Amino acid sequence: MFNFFKKIVNKIKGEEAKEKKRQSVPKEELEEILIGFDIQYDLIESLLKHLGDLITPKQLEVALLRFVRGDSYYDKTRLKTITTKPLVHLIVGVNGAGKTTTIAKLAKLSLKQHKKALLGAGDTFRAAAVKQLQLWGEKLNIQVISAKEGSDPSSLAYNTIESAIAKNIDEVFIDTAGRLHNQTNLKNELSKIARTCSKVLKDAPFYKFLILDGTQGSSGLTQAKIFHETLALDGVIMTKLDGTSKGGAILSVLYELKLPILYLGMGEKEDDLIAFDEERFIEDLVDAVFVGQ
């Protein structure tokens, strides 16, 4: 699943790594490999500080589990269960992270569960974003609520949820703008949208998911923190993990934001969304580290 780890190890070693597994690796070499995965350095220090000079696969696995499962060091939150109908998902993230495509993927999952879905084109200042969501709606046969360019996105969110209530829709997915260059305005806009969602839902809970570009590495955390501070996010979906991603951002999100990673976007098709599996993630990372030379 996480082949990018093995690619990075091969690059660090300067040759195609053999499949034979090593029994241990020196701490300095392990540190170099983890840096190559684009895992932030303070996280690496925390992982390795209680380990010896030679580290076994089991020792690394246990250290990683402490971060992603919760230990005395940090408690990872789990996605809260919401039973409200319609179940509203407010989707946020910077432009280019893959919000619109991810919304289509989430809607496709909803359809597979025999649920009725509705989409809201809340990035009202970008005609291209609205058009893209409408095209996905046509492809998936899902209605898209939209408004004229430049309309108030909060009103769009309100109308989308009102329509969902009237039509007995199960799940709603609302797109949003992601103009971080105008950070203050964006934060105010997102806060207003969230308040509007709460109002029309009569204070019933709803999900706020961040779409994070996996190719950004640790630098994407700065963006993520802004959204989390603004909205108190419920979870993260990481995209573009089929390309140049180094994978380390996954650990960094768990470590820094203490938010669950829900799905991974592994391509551009509506089915290219897989549930994040912590055990498989750790297993693949450890396997890549201990590939023989």
UniProtKB/Swiss-Prot annotation:
GO biological process, any: protein targeting
Catalysed transformations (reactions): GTP + H2O = GDP + phosphate + H(+)
GO MF annotation list: GTP binding; GTPase activity; signal recognition particle binding
InterPro entries the record matches: P-loop_NTPase, SR_rcpt_FtsY, SRP54_GTPase_dom, SRP54_N_sf
GO CC annotations, alphabetized: cytoplasm; plasma membrane
Compartments, record wording: Cell inner membrane; Cytoplasm
Classification lineage: Bacteria, Pseudomonadati, Campylobacterota, Epsilonproteobacteria, Campylobacterales
Binding site for GTP: 93-100, 175-179, 239-242
Pfam families recorded: SRP54
Main location: membrane
Keywords: Cell inner membrane, Cell membrane, Cytoplasm, GTP-binding, Hydrolase, Membrane, Nucleotide-binding, Receptor
TM helices/strands, residue ranges: none
Membrane topology listed for this record: Peripheral membrane protein
EC numbers on record: 3.6.5.4
Quaternary state and interactors: Part of the signal recognition particle protein translocation system, which is composed of SRP and FtsY. SRP is a ribonucleoprotein composed of Ffh and a 4.5S RNA molecule.
Full protein name: Signal recognition particle receptor FtsY
Family: Belongs to the GTP-binding SRP family. FtsY subfamily.
